[in-house]
Amino acid sequence: FDIRGVLDGPSFKPYSGSAYNSLAPKAAPNASQWLTTNNGNKTHTFAQAPYIGDSISKDGIQVGTNTANPQQAVYADKTYQPEPQVGESQWNASVSNNAKAAGRVLKSTTPMYPCYGSYARATNEKGGQSKNNDGVEMRFFASSANDNQNDPTVVMYSEDVNLEAPDTHIVYKPAVTADTISSELLHGQQAAPNRPNYIAFRDNFYWALYYNSTGNMGVLAGQASQLNAVVDLQDRNTELSYQLMLDALGDRSRYFSMWNSAVDSYDPDVRIIENHGVEDELPNYCFPLGAVGVVNSYKGVKQNDGNGWVKDDSVADTNDIAKGNIFAMEINLQANLWRSFLYSNVGLYLPDDLKYTPGNIKLPENKNTYEYMNGRVTVPGLVDTYVNIGARWYPDVMDNINPFNHHRNAGLRYRSMLLGNGRFVPFHIQVPQKFFAIKNLLLLPGSYTYEWNFRKDVNMILQSTLGN
């Protein structure tokens, strides 16, 4: 007979999509505005103005000149210009204090979110993202160093967009008053990627059934001294041993598409964390793109016939020279890669009682939801890296947590792909001949025994990388 159904509900989110702005620092804010109520409502702006134009007028930043006679300035189309990804093409491009610059900024009415993970869908054919093309406002800025000079040198195009974060969640949020969506404090928010959640069935059951021909059809097995088909799920070690035995004995792991029966398998470090000797000798440095330190502007001078110094007219007035060592940063790449692996593959799979909810973050009351499990974090020091010389180790809890629910499980990942990985997945399981039941199988409550019996080592539950 067949079992048909649909996987859906609050805990089902199969994968993490596109990872928008994944190169952005986890705490980098979007260019944004906010209001303060000190001395009346005042708008503050925090933004980058990457586009350098020829001039600024009441019409905005000049982006070119047309070929008419006489020639006329062409100003930015505010529905999509200036484009935020367009700026100076060289690291050494000279931008003077009087250069005319422009950029885009989010209005205070768009909720703040870190740049990491942010996504705003396009709303016009040019790629502009404003909710309302007529709602883009120009905000002009002049240097505050000269009180007598008010000519603008920067114009920011302020807009509201449909800001989403489909693949990330907030892990740090400063304390702000309720319903605050934009403020200076919220620039300090930090985002982290959502964990993938592969959902699949362990098996499609064909291989696990055998026929009981004793004539006791319809009779409870316990009454007829036969095998009882209502069995408990196996403990973790038995389950792992059985999977590895199947992998070693049969072809099931090779030809698994037919029965949706891919054998569970893992990266070795997910089960037993290994260190091989000490590999921590060489430091890693990074340097500025210009390969010099902080530069100052110098003019050329020459000796005046042995009597003091005078300006050298054969040398430019602005020579950029840095003194001393080049600034450099050191990072332990090896340790950070290992630390990141441990946190993502061990720390985030620790039991819930070893995790905590970040401050000021509101998670659902239902602990079985994807949003709750995904939002909980582990103290990094719990699985922090250290130089462990030539030894094998793992936290005790790893021996008590079912390792089959893990995003590095190739078998689960493949079976999840067969289901389609959609947000709502119809499934269809074909089972030979008769009804069956297994204790704790969510889809078939109750206990029944018919002529088809299960082997004692059944392996058929709905599994997910976030938990059964």
Curated annotation (Swiss-Prot):
Family assignment from sequence similarity: Belongs to the adenoviridae hexon protein family.
Keyword field contains Lipid biosynthesis: no
Name assigned to this protein: Hexon protein
InterPro entries xref list: Adenovirus_Pll_hexon_N, Adenovirus_Pll_hexon_sub3, VP_dsDNA_II
Keywords: Capsid protein, Cytoplasmic inwards viral transport, Host nucleus, Host-virus interaction, Late protein, Microtubular inwards viral transport, T=25 icosahedral capsid protein, Virion, Virus entry into host cell
GO cellular component, one term: T=25 icosahedral viral capsid
Induction, per UniProt: Expressed in the late phase of the viral replicative cycle.
Other remarks on this protein: All late proteins expressed from the major late promoter are produced by alternative splicing and alternative polyadenylation of the same gene giving rise to non-overlapping ORFs. A leader sequence is present in the N-terminus of all these mRNAs and is recognized by the viral shutoff protein to provide expression although conventional translation via ribosome scanning from the cap has been shut off in the host cell.
